Amino acid sequence: VETTAEHILDAVERLVCIEGTRKLTIDAVAAEAGMSKGGVLYNFRSKQELLLGVIRRVVTEVRERTYALSDKLTEQGVACPILRASFQIYKEYREKTAPKALFALAAQEPELVAEFQDMSTEFGRAISSEISDPVLGHMCLLIIDGLYYRQALDIEHCSAGEIDELIDRVLEISSQNSRHAVLNAEAGN
């Protein structure tokens, strides 16, 4: 069951995707959410709190889902679990407004995205630690970032199927170069 605060944040995401943050007002959020201005202000006292609420919600959800999936993949003995989880979360988010909202916020309100930057750095380190080749690890990070940015900017010209093929190929190459695979190969020699 969606809470009132979540309903308001959904409205903020939609508005930020359409109008950006500069035209975002409490009145506009209230209208988009179908509630009174007082109802919005009861949950969020300012535009800044609304924007931070969107960022925190996305960061929390992505972090929790990525680590939960990574833990499950680790239990299954799958190579590069954080990388695989990151691509899976991308697939789940590619039709949602959250990445577009985050991109708009980063462009217009860069001081608000520190939590997102921290999460990105955290995932980057985790992915890099899974892959034995540092250049390949960096390539994987750039591919993930590029997929999100292209989606957020609506400039993706590849179909979902083509992107899935790209992701499968990256995961295949990464798995062959995972620290787990390298350790197993060395143990076999």
Language-model features: where?
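Hydrophobic alpha-helical connector segments
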Residues: 53, 60-99
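Hydrophobic/aromatic-rich alpha-helical bundle segments in the mid-to-C-terminal region
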Residues: 111-117, 121-189
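Generic hydrophobic, amphipathic alpha-helix propensity
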Residues: 4-15, 29, 54-58, 62
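Short alpha-helical scaffolding segments that buttress acidic/His motifs in well-ordered protein cores
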Residues: 86-90, 99-106, 140-147
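Solvent-exposed, amphipathic alpha-helical segments
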Residues: 11-18, 65-68, 143-150
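Helix-turn-helix
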Residues: 7, 15-49
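Conserved, surface-exposed functional patches that form binding/active-site neighborhoods
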Residues: 91-98, 106-109, 113-117
